[in-house]
Amino acid sequence: MNKNKPFIVVIVGPTASGKTELSIELAKRINGEIISGDSMQVYKHMNIGTAKVTPEEMDGIPHHLIDILNPDDTFSAYEFKRLAEDLITDITNRGKVPIIAGGTGLYIQSLIYNYELEDETVTSAQLSVVKQKLSALEHLDNQQLHDYLAQFDEASAKNIHPNNRQRVLRAIEYYFKTKKLLSNRKKVQQFTENYDTLLIGIEMSRKTLYSRINKRVDIMLDHGLFREVQQLVEQGYESCRSMQAIGYKELIPVINGQMIYEDAVNDLKQHSRQYAKRQMTWFKNKMSVHWLDKENMSLQMMLDEITTQIK
Protein backbone atom coordinates (compact mmCIF):
# COMPACT_ATOMS: atom_id res chain seq x y z
CA MET A 1 0.00 0.00 0.00
CA ASN A 2 1.14 3.53 -0.81
CA LYS A 3 0.76 5.52 2.40
CA ASN A 4 1.17 8.79 0.50
CA LYS A 5 -2.19 8.32 -1.22
CA PRO A 6 -5.64 7.44 0.16
CA PHE A 7 -6.32 3.72 -0.19
CA ILE A 8 -9.53 2.65 -1.92
CA VAL A 9 -11.01 -0.64 -3.03
CA VAL A 10 -12.98 -0.69 -6.27
CA ILE A 11 -15.25 -3.62 -7.14
CA VAL A 12 -16.41 -3.86 -10.74
CA GLY A 13 -18.16 -6.42 -12.88
CA PRO A 14 -21.17 -6.84 -15.13
CA THR A 15 -24.75 -6.52 -14.01
CA ALA A 16 -25.96 -9.43 -11.84
CA SER A 17 -22.41 -10.56 -11.00
CA GLY A 18 -22.73 -10.10 -7.24
CA LYS A 19 -20.95 -6.79 -6.62
CA THR A 20 -23.41 -5.72 -3.92
CA GLU A 21 -22.99 -8.80 -1.75
CA LEU A 22 -19.20 -8.84 -2.10
CA SER A 23 -18.83 -5.15 -1.29
CA ILE A 24 -20.99 -5.38 1.83
CA GLU A 25 -19.19 -8.42 3.21
CA LEU A 26 -15.83 -6.82 2.43
CA ALA A 27 -16.86 -3.63 4.22
CA LYS A 28 -17.59 -5.70 7.33
CA ARG A 29 -14.11 -7.21 7.18
CA ILE A 30 -12.05 -4.10 6.57
CA ASN A 31 -14.13 -1.40 8.31
CA GLY A 32 -15.33 0.07 5.05
CA GLU A 33 -18.08 2.28 3.70
CA ILE A 34 -19.53 1.85 0.23
CA ILE A 35 -19.79 4.46 -2.51
CA SER A 36 -22.10 3.45 -5.34
CA GLY A 37 -20.45 3.65 -8.75
CA ASP A 38 -23.72 3.13 -10.58
CA SER A 39 -25.18 5.88 -12.75
CA MET A 40 -28.80 4.90 -12.01
CA GLN A 41 -28.88 4.17 -8.29
CA VAL A 42 -28.61 7.90 -7.57
CA TYR A 43 -32.31 8.24 -8.51
CA LYS A 44 -35.13 8.06 -6.00
CA HIS A 45 -38.18 5.90 -6.81
CA MET A 46 -36.15 3.76 -9.24
CA ASN A 47 -35.41 0.85 -6.95
CA ILE A 48 -36.31 -2.47 -8.50
CA GLY A 49 -35.12 -1.79 -12.04
CA THR A 50 -31.74 -0.54 -10.84
CA ALA A 51 -31.26 -3.49 -8.45
CA LYS A 52 -30.75 -0.92 -5.71
CA VAL A 53 -29.40 -2.28 -2.46
CA THR A 54 -32.10 -2.51 0.21
CA PRO A 55 -31.72 -1.37 3.83
CA GLU A 56 -31.85 -5.03 4.88
CA GLU A 57 -29.05 -5.94 2.47
CA MET A 58 -26.93 -3.02 3.71
CA ASP A 59 -26.87 -4.74 7.10
CA GLY A 60 -25.69 -1.58 8.83
CA ILE A 61 -22.94 -0.73 6.33
CA PRO A 62 -23.10 2.96 5.27
CA HIS A 63 -23.84 3.46 1.56
CA HIS A 64 -23.33 6.69 -0.37
CA LEU A 65 -24.58 8.18 -3.68
CA ILE A 66 -27.87 6.30 -3.50
CA ASP A 67 -31.27 8.07 -3.65
CA ILE A 68 -29.81 11.57 -3.95
CA LEU A 69 -31.70 12.82 -7.04
CA ASN A 70 -35.18 12.84 -8.55
CA PRO A 71 -35.72 11.00 -11.86
CA ASP A 72 -35.91 14.27 -13.80
CA ASP A 73 -32.51 15.41 -12.53
CA THR A 74 -29.34 14.83 -14.52
CA PHE A 75 -26.17 13.15 -13.35
CA SER A 76 -22.86 12.83 -15.14
CA ALA A 77 -19.35 11.48 -14.67
CA TYR A 78 -18.32 14.98 -13.58
CA GLU A 79 -20.82 15.06 -10.70
CA PHE A 80 -19.94 11.51 -9.74
CA LYS A 81 -16.21 12.21 -9.64
CA ARG A 82 -16.65 15.39 -7.61
CA LEU A 83 -18.95 13.78 -5.05
CA ALA A 84 -16.94 10.56 -4.83
CA GLU A 85 -13.69 12.45 -4.23
CA ASP A 86 -15.28 14.35 -1.34
CA LEU A 87 -16.66 11.12 0.12
CA ILE A 88 -13.31 9.34 -0.15
CA THR A 89 -11.66 12.17 1.76
CA ASP A 90 -14.34 12.09 4.46
CA ILE A 91 -14.37 8.30 4.84
CA THR A 92 -10.57 8.13 4.94
CA ASN A 93 -10.35 10.92 7.51
CA ARG A 94 -12.70 8.94 9.75
CA GLY A 95 -10.32 5.98 9.66
CA LYS A 96 -12.43 3.83 7.36
CA VAL A 97 -11.82 2.31 3.93
CA PRO A 98 -13.76 3.65 0.91
CA ILE A 99 -15.15 0.84 -1.25
CA ILE A 100 -16.48 1.90 -4.66
CA ALA A 101 -18.82 -0.69 -6.15
CA GLY A 102 -20.52 -0.36 -9.50
CA GLY A 103 -20.74 -1.19 -13.14
CA THR A 104 -20.65 2.21 -14.84
CA GLY A 105 -17.22 2.02 -16.47
CA LEU A 106 -16.73 5.69 -17.29
CA TYR A 107 -17.56 6.74 -13.74
CA ILE A 108 -15.06 4.30 -12.25
CA GLN A 109 -12.41 5.13 -14.82
CA SER A 110 -12.76 8.89 -14.39
CA LEU A 111 -12.22 8.53 -10.65
CA ILE A 112 -9.30 6.10 -10.72
CA TYR A 113 -7.39 7.70 -13.57
CA ASN A 114 -8.23 11.29 -12.61
CA TYR A 115 -10.02 12.40 -15.76
CA GLU A 116 -10.47 16.12 -16.19
CA LEU A 117 -14.16 16.44 -16.92
CA GLU A 118 -16.11 19.53 -17.84
CA ASP A 119 -18.40 21.08 -15.26
CA GLU A 120 -21.97 21.05 -16.57
CA THR A 121 -23.47 22.68 -13.50
CA VAL A 122 -26.22 25.17 -14.33
CA THR A 123 -28.52 27.35 -12.24
CA SER A 124 -32.00 26.10 -11.36
CA ALA A 125 -33.47 28.63 -13.82
CA GLN A 126 -31.19 27.41 -16.60
CA LEU A 127 -31.99 23.80 -15.77
CA SER A 128 -35.70 24.59 -16.00
CA VAL A 129 -35.18 25.95 -19.51
CA VAL A 130 -33.20 22.85 -20.50
CA LYS A 131 -35.97 20.59 -19.21
CA GLN A 132 -38.57 22.58 -21.18
CA LYS A 133 -36.53 22.23 -24.35
CA LEU A 134 -36.13 18.49 -23.83
CA SER A 135 -39.84 18.10 -23.10
CA ALA A 136 -40.61 19.78 -26.41
CA LEU A 137 -38.74 16.95 -28.15
CA GLU A 138 -40.37 14.02 -26.39
CA HIS A 139 -42.96 13.53 -29.17
CA LEU A 140 -40.19 12.73 -31.66
CA ASP A 141 -39.50 9.10 -32.44
CA ASN A 142 -35.93 7.76 -32.27
CA GLN A 143 -35.03 8.57 -35.87
CA GLN A 144 -36.51 12.05 -35.72
CA LEU A 145 -34.63 12.77 -32.50
CA HIS A 146 -31.42 11.51 -34.08
CA ASP A 147 -32.01 13.74 -37.11
CA TYR A 148 -32.49 16.69 -34.78
CA LEU A 149 -29.13 16.01 -33.14
CA ALA A 150 -27.44 15.74 -36.53
CA GLN A 151 -28.54 19.29 -37.38
CA PHE A 152 -26.04 20.78 -34.92
CA ASP A 153 -23.71 17.90 -33.93
CA GLU A 154 -23.18 15.69 -36.93
CA ALA A 155 -20.12 14.01 -35.43
CA SER A 156 -22.03 12.82 -32.36
CA ALA A 157 -24.92 11.66 -34.53
CA LYS A 158 -22.54 9.54 -36.60
CA ASN A 159 -21.22 7.86 -33.46
CA ILE A 160 -24.59 7.17 -31.84
CA HIS A 161 -27.14 4.69 -33.17
CA PRO A 162 -30.61 6.23 -33.65
CA ASN A 163 -32.14 3.59 -31.38
CA ASN A 164 -29.87 4.55 -28.50
CA ARG A 165 -32.28 7.24 -27.39
CA GLN A 166 -30.56 7.78 -24.05
CA ARG A 167 -27.22 8.70 -25.65
CA VAL A 168 -28.93 10.88 -28.27
CA LEU A 169 -30.76 12.75 -25.50
CA ARG A 170 -27.51 13.06 -23.59
CA ALA A 171 -25.81 14.77 -26.56
CA ILE A 172 -28.75 17.12 -27.04
CA GLU A 173 -28.94 17.91 -23.34
CA TYR A 174 -25.19 18.64 -23.26
CA TYR A 175 -25.64 21.16 -26.08
CA PHE A 176 -28.61 22.81 -24.37
CA LYS A 177 -26.68 23.13 -21.10
CA THR A 178 -23.27 24.21 -22.39
CA LYS A 179 -23.86 25.56 -25.92
CA LYS A 180 -21.03 23.23 -26.90
CA LEU A 181 -20.91 20.03 -28.94
CA LEU A 182 -20.49 16.77 -27.09
CA SER A 183 -18.28 15.53 -29.91
CA ASN A 184 -15.81 18.34 -29.15
CA ARG A 185 -15.61 17.64 -25.45
CA LYS A 186 -12.13 16.77 -24.35
CA LYS A 187 -11.60 14.06 -21.81
CA VAL A 188 -8.07 14.28 -20.49
CA GLN A 189 -6.58 11.30 -18.72
CA GLN A 190 -3.92 12.05 -16.17
CA PHE A 191 -1.22 9.46 -15.70
CA THR A 192 -0.72 10.20 -12.01
CA GLU A 193 -3.45 8.48 -10.03
CA ASN A 194 -5.01 10.18 -7.03
CA TYR A 195 -5.46 6.97 -5.08
CA ASP A 196 -3.75 3.77 -4.06
CA THR A 197 -6.35 1.57 -5.73
CA LEU A 198 -7.07 -2.12 -5.38
CA LEU A 199 -9.24 -2.83 -8.42
CA ILE A 200 -11.20 -6.07 -8.08
CA GLY A 201 -13.45 -7.58 -10.75
CA ILE A 202 -16.01 -10.39 -10.63
CA GLU A 203 -16.12 -12.66 -13.66
CA MET A 204 -17.79 -15.90 -14.72
CA SER A 205 -18.62 -17.74 -17.92
CA ARG A 206 -20.99 -16.01 -20.30
CA LYS A 207 -23.46 -18.88 -19.97
CA THR A 208 -23.57 -18.54 -16.20
CA LEU A 209 -23.80 -14.75 -16.32
CA TYR A 210 -26.64 -14.77 -18.85
CA SER A 211 -28.53 -17.30 -16.76
CA ARG A 212 -28.13 -15.07 -13.69
CA ILE A 213 -29.34 -12.05 -15.67
CA ASN A 214 -32.44 -13.83 -16.97
CA LYS A 215 -33.26 -15.04 -13.46
CA ARG A 216 -32.78 -11.60 -11.96
CA VAL A 217 -35.12 -10.00 -14.50
CA ASP A 218 -37.78 -12.55 -13.54
CA ILE A 219 -37.24 -11.73 -9.86
CA MET A 220 -37.47 -7.98 -10.54
CA LEU A 221 -40.78 -8.48 -12.31
CA ASP A 222 -42.06 -10.69 -9.48
CA HIS A 223 -41.10 -7.94 -7.03
CA GLY A 224 -43.11 -5.28 -8.86
CA LEU A 225 -40.91 -3.74 -11.56
CA PHE A 226 -43.85 -3.19 -13.91
CA ARG A 227 -45.76 -1.28 -11.22
CA GLU A 228 -42.65 0.76 -10.43
CA VAL A 229 -42.43 1.88 -14.06
CA GLN A 230 -46.18 2.59 -14.12
CA GLN A 231 -45.88 4.84 -11.08
CA LEU A 232 -42.97 6.76 -12.60
CA VAL A 233 -44.97 7.31 -15.80
CA GLU A 234 -47.99 8.44 -13.77
CA GLN A 235 -45.76 10.92 -11.92
CA GLY A 236 -44.74 12.50 -15.21
CA TYR A 237 -41.23 11.10 -15.57
CA GLU A 238 -41.78 9.17 -18.81
CA SER A 239 -39.72 11.50 -21.02
CA CYS A 240 -36.80 11.86 -18.59
CA ARG A 241 -33.39 10.60 -19.64
CA SER A 242 -33.28 8.34 -16.58
CA MET A 243 -36.29 6.46 -17.96
CA GLN A 244 -34.24 5.37 -20.96
CA ALA A 245 -32.33 3.02 -18.69
CA ILE A 246 -32.62 -0.72 -19.18
CA GLY A 247 -35.52 -2.03 -17.14
CA TYR A 248 -37.64 1.05 -17.73
CA LYS A 249 -37.57 1.85 -21.43
CA GLU A 250 -38.66 -1.69 -22.34
CA LEU A 251 -41.84 -1.55 -20.23
CA ILE A 252 -43.05 1.91 -21.20
CA PRO A 253 -44.44 0.69 -24.57
CA VAL A 254 -46.48 -1.95 -22.70
CA ILE A 255 -47.96 0.74 -20.46
CA ASN A 256 -48.79 2.80 -23.55
CA GLY A 257 -50.40 -0.16 -25.32
CA GLN A 258 -47.73 -0.33 -28.00
CA MET A 259 -46.23 -3.74 -27.16
CA ILE A 260 -47.30 -6.96 -25.51
CA TYR A 261 -45.82 -7.75 -22.11
CA GLU A 262 -44.04 -10.96 -23.13
CA ASP A 263 -42.15 -9.24 -25.95
CA ALA A 264 -41.07 -6.45 -23.62
CA VAL A 265 -39.74 -8.96 -21.09
CA ASN A 266 -37.74 -10.70 -23.81
CA ASP A 267 -36.32 -7.32 -24.88
CA LEU A 268 -35.44 -6.50 -21.29
CA LYS A 269 -33.52 -9.73 -20.86
CA GLN A 270 -31.75 -9.32 -24.19
CA HIS A 271 -30.79 -5.71 -23.51
CA SER A 272 -29.49 -6.67 -20.05
CA ARG A 273 -27.32 -9.42 -21.54
CA GLN A 274 -25.99 -7.07 -24.20
CA TYR A 275 -25.20 -4.45 -21.57
CA ALA A 276 -23.31 -7.00 -19.48
CA LYS A 277 -21.22 -7.91 -22.51
CA ARG A 278 -20.38 -4.24 -23.11
CA GLN A 279 -19.45 -3.82 -19.45
CA MET A 280 -17.01 -6.73 -19.56
CA THR A 281 -15.46 -5.43 -22.77
CA TRP A 282 -14.92 -2.04 -21.14
CA PHE A 283 -13.38 -3.43 -17.95
CA LYS A 284 -11.17 -5.93 -19.80
CA ASN A 285 -9.88 -3.42 -22.35
CA LYS A 286 -9.63 -0.17 -20.42
CA MET A 287 -8.78 -1.07 -16.85
CA SER A 288 -6.18 -3.17 -15.06
CA VAL A 289 -8.39 -5.43 -12.96
CA HIS A 290 -7.57 -8.26 -10.55
CA TRP A 291 -10.26 -10.73 -11.58
CA LEU A 292 -11.98 -13.21 -9.26
CA ASP A 293 -13.72 -16.23 -10.81
CA LYS A 294 -17.12 -16.45 -9.14
CA GLU A 295 -17.77 -19.93 -10.52
CA ASN A 296 -14.70 -21.39 -8.83
CA MET A 297 -14.49 -19.22 -5.72
CA SER A 298 -16.90 -19.01 -2.82
CA LEU A 299 -17.72 -15.66 -1.28
CA GLN A 300 -15.33 -16.40 1.59
CA MET A 301 -12.55 -17.33 -0.84
CA MET A 302 -13.01 -14.04 -2.70
CA LEU A 303 -12.94 -12.10 0.56
CA ASP A 304 -9.77 -13.91 1.63
CA GLU A 305 -8.12 -13.12 -1.71
CA ILE A 306 -9.00 -9.43 -1.46
CA THR A 307 -7.77 -9.09 2.12
CA THR A 308 -4.54 -10.84 1.11
CA GLN A 309 -4.08 -8.26 -1.65
CA ILE A 310 -4.61 -5.45 0.85
CA LYS A 311 -1.94 -6.77 3.20
Swiss-Prot record:
EC number: 2.5.1.75
Region (Interaction with substrate tRNA): 38-41, 166-170
Signal sequence extent: none
Cross-referenced InterPro entries: Dimethylallyltransferase, IPT, P-loop_NTPase
Function field: Catalyzes the transfer of a dimethylallyl group onto the adenine at position 37 in tRNAs that read codons beginning with uridine, leading to the formation of N6-(dimethylallyl)adenosine (i(6)A).
Family, per entry: Belongs to the IPP transferase family.
UniProt name for this protein: tRNA dimethylallyltransferase
Native organism: Staphylococcus aureus (strain bovine RF122 / ET3-1)
Gene name as annotated: miaA
